[in-house]
């Protein structure tokens, strides 16, 4: 994963993604008739925007990537809770680009780039971020993630790679995913389900399994298969190497993947990445990292000032007051009307300049 250094470009076949227990629009993209994603159409830049676009084409992306990594680490230290299970949600979202970005690669559905994220639901912040061409396989990026002992990694079927799954198990970590439809599994023994009912789903089968194909040596770890029936009547299959958690707890972990989908939706709708100042590869990467830096800064500011309002409302208030001198801890309070005495124009904790 890229948090420091110059982001690299990877090319391979695109991965696939599966449905969730709690279905939402894939990657938060607004659907068009026929299920196609709406492309970002960069418009020709105005004369006033051209100097900034030219600068974005030359600025080193590595500086922004390193800044995001430092902020993500700071936010993790603020929110870390001893004794809590470490959960890591892994997913990617496409960033469709228009015709002006002729350099963008296509994965068969869209032409553009792809943002890969490792998300910590406890701190509500991405821990790792990578930006690649749209045709890069999700499993290719997954194999570059540093595995944390004791953590549980939750991802969809696009991250199917037996070697990576084995590495997770050997690092004494866990994964919860969905197997591909062509993955042959043989039941070793049935497991007793103590509690079957969950929040909006029911676990109807729990079994220890192994690969049924001749290549079972490629995945020499014990596996557990769960069959889960959702409230809408559909059933899905989950696969994990966690043999201790209750079946209903594992199903609930996978259902929690909707949190990273909401993150993608929030970023695209509220951090202004639907249009870019610059149409080359460097400018687009730079603005994507800048959007994630803004997200991390908002989360840090909210926690330092004990702001408990929804992040969406906090973001809207910050945007409205961006060019005003306001106490961020009281940003939700309206400014005084006709104050009886003149108040200083700047915060007492903010440096200001004046003629003497």
Swiss-Prot record:
Disordered: annotated span: 1-54, 334-356
Protein name (database record): Putative transposase y4zB
InterPro entries: RNaseH-like_sf (IPR012337), Transpos_IS4 (IPR047952), Transposase_11 (IPR002559)
Cross-referenced Pfam families: DDE_Tnp_1 (PF01609)
Keywords: DNA recombination, DNA-binding, Plasmid, Transposable element, Transposition
A single GO BP: DNA transposition
Source organism of the structure: Sinorhizobium fredii (strain NBRC 101917 / NGR234)
GO molecular-function terms, A-Z: DNA binding; transposase activity
Protein family membership: Belongs to the transposase 11 family.
NCBIfam families assigned to the protein according to its UniProt record, in alphabetical order: transpos_IS4_1
Transmembrane segment boundaries: none
Domain of life of the source: Bacteria
Skewed-composition ranges (Low complexity): 1-19
